[in-house]
């Protein structure tokens, strides 16, 4: 990020000062590219999208992963990663409340270390009446356990209120798992609409409608296959080449 998600009064001043010591930049999204040029109009940089993570094991079938997590429901949705205010977990909880009775037979996995008071989310879940459908793991997940959460899931949901880019989408793509994301920041840049996922407004109504439509379309296997092809463009070699080009200029 150029500017932190939770902004501070000194961010702009400190960023400008810090960038004065930088020779060149690699930006991972067009949003960050625009932010960089607003600070350093003549910046020397390369644009290279966030690569797909390839460090996670992908050895479990959906059935095996669900068994390990003790999930018996047919539908599984995943919210994964650090839980901070800008991640919009409240949006997702409120969305699930709206479609709770319609969706049926589902589990929402909330997995990630909470950088806020988790009690507020526990209270939201209770008030939404979806406690029985939500499995929470409010702590860091080591690399060797990441796979079971993604392998068990039909879709990864990112209801972010702001975003530069997302490593979570690229983990989802590693497991050929589709995504539903907010149309903010750099997130739409890495989603092929209707083929690898869906982009919607960051509101509970929009996410409720998108999640309901996702399951009504019943084309998860097609999305999985699309992602398998689409993700090849997000390679680590491309980023290495971008860095080498900067260094060799």
Please identify what each model-predicted range represents.
Residues 20-59:
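Donor nucleotide-sugar binding/catalytic pocket of nucleotide-sugar-dependent glycosyltransferases
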Residues 52, 80, 107-121, 139:
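Glycosyltransferase donor-sugar binding loop
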Residues 57-71:
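A short helix/loop element that forms part of the nucleotide-sugar donor recognition site in Leloir-type
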Residues 71-87, 93-96:
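Conserved donor-binding/catalytic core segment of Leloir-type glycosyltransferases
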Residues 121-140:
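Nucleotide-activated donor-binding/catalytic signature segment of Leloir-type glycosyltransferases, i.e.
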Residues 178-181, 191:
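Short hydrophobic beta-strand element within catalytic cores of glycosyltransferases
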Residues 193-194, 198-205, 211-219:
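Conserved acidic donor-binding segment of nucleotide-sugar-dependent glycosyltransferases
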């Amino acid at each position: 990020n150029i500017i932190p998600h939770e902004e501070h009064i000194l961010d702009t001043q400190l960023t400008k000062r810090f960038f004065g010591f930088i020779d060149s930049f690699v930006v991972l999204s067009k949003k960050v590219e625009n932010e960089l040029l607003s600070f350093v109009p003549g910046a020397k940089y390369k644009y290279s999208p966030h690569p797909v993570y390839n460090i996670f094991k992908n050895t479990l079938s959906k059935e095996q992963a669900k068994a390990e997590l003790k999930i018996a429901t047919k539908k599984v949705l995943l919210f994964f990663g650090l839980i901070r205010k800008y991640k919009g977990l409240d949006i997702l909880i409120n969305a699930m409340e709206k479609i709770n009775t319609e969706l049926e037979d589902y589990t929402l996995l909330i997995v990630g270390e909470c950088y806020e008071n988790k009690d507020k989310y526990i209270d939201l879940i209770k008030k939404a009446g979806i406690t029985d459908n939500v499995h929470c793991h409010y702590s860091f997940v080591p690399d060797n356990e990441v796979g079971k959460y993604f392998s068990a899931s039909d879709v990864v949901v990112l209801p972010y209120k702001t975003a530069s880019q997302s490593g979570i989408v690229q983990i989802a793509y590693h497991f050929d798992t589709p995504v539903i994301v907010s149309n903010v920041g750099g997130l739409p840049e890495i989603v092929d609409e209707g083929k690898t996922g869906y982009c919607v407004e960051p509101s509970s109504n929009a996410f409720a409608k998108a999640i309901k439509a996702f399951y009504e379309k019943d084309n998860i296997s097609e999305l999985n296959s699309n992602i398998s092809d689409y993700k090849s463009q997000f390679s680590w070699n491309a980023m290495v080449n971008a860095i080498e080009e900067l260094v060799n200029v």
